[in-house]
Regions:
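Single conserved hydrophobic/aromatic residue that forms the stacking wall/gate
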Residues: 174-185
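P-loop (Walker A) phosphate-binding loop of NTP-binding proteins
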Residues: 9
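A glycine- and Lys/Arg-enriched "phosphate-lid" helix/loop adjacent to the NTP-binding pocket
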Residues: 83-128, 136, 140-141
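Phosphate-binding beta-loop-alpha motif at adenosine-nucleotide cofactor sites
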Residues: 134-145, 172-173
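Post-Walker A helix-loop "phosphate-sensing" segment adjacent to the P-loop in P-loop NTPases
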Residues: 23-30
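Conserved glycine(s) of the Walker
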Residues: 13
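Hydrophobic anchor at the beta1->P-loop junction of P-loop NTPases
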Residues: 6
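Conserved nucleotide-sensing/catalytic segment adjacent to the nucleotide-binding pocket
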Residues: 30, 40-73
Length: 185
């Protein structure tokens, strides 16, 4: 089983990453609590449930302290479960702008009644174990949604990236094409 743990700051692009991973064949589970990580991975490997490629999204909604994260990762290590970590990040000013543009509130801001800036600082501290152990870190500061998705596909698609598709549309205004034009001769 290929196990990928996806984490990162709220608003940095985890949902885009998870959607891209699902598009390239990963079985994706969002918002996994730290306490359930070892159980979910064991279930994913067991008998008829054996899944080939699993991506688990973990963030501050299910991981309330850095100690919980450390303990969950330690349990995976003790069980001999191999995994990789993808950490999605962006600078605080970019995340603040994204929250402002979408008019959404940060999950910690809602739960604890603190400012978005304070919530981001707390979130960075909580998620630090993921960041420190990350095999891949993507800074989405200068990436569009499409570029973020493309980067994920290039990293994790079995063939090394999504195949390019090209569509050609021809408009014939005044005449039909001759058979020679269609055959390419």
């Amino acid at each position: 089983m290929d196990l990928l743990i996806v984490s990162g700051l709220s608003g940095a692009g985890k949902s885009v990453a998870m959607n891209a991973l699902e598009d390239i064949g990963f079985f994706c589970i969002d918002n996994v609590p730290a306490e359930l990580l070892p159980s979910i991975t064991a279930f994913s490997k067991a008998g008829d449930n054996q899944l080939k490629r699993v991506a688990l999204s973990m963030d501050v909604r299910g991981c309330h302290t850095s100690e919980q994260i450390e303990q969950a990762l330690h349990q995976l290590d003790e069980q001999g479960i191999e995994y990789e970590i993808l950490f999605i990040d962006a600078p605080d000013d970019v995340l603040m702008r994204r929250y402002s543009e979408t008019r959404r509130r940060h999950p910690i801001s809602i739960a604890e009644g603190i400012s978005t800036r304070e919530a981001l600082a707390k979130e960075r501290q909580i998620l630090q174990p993921f960041r420190e152990r990350a095999d891949y870190t993507i800074n989405t500061e200068f990436l569009s949604t499409a570029q973020n998705k493309e980067r994920i596909c290039n990293l994790f698609a079995p063939d090394g990236g999504a195949k390019a598709a090209m569509r050609l549309t021809v408009c014939l205004l005044y005449t039909s094409p001759s058979p020679r034009d269609i055959s390419g001769s």
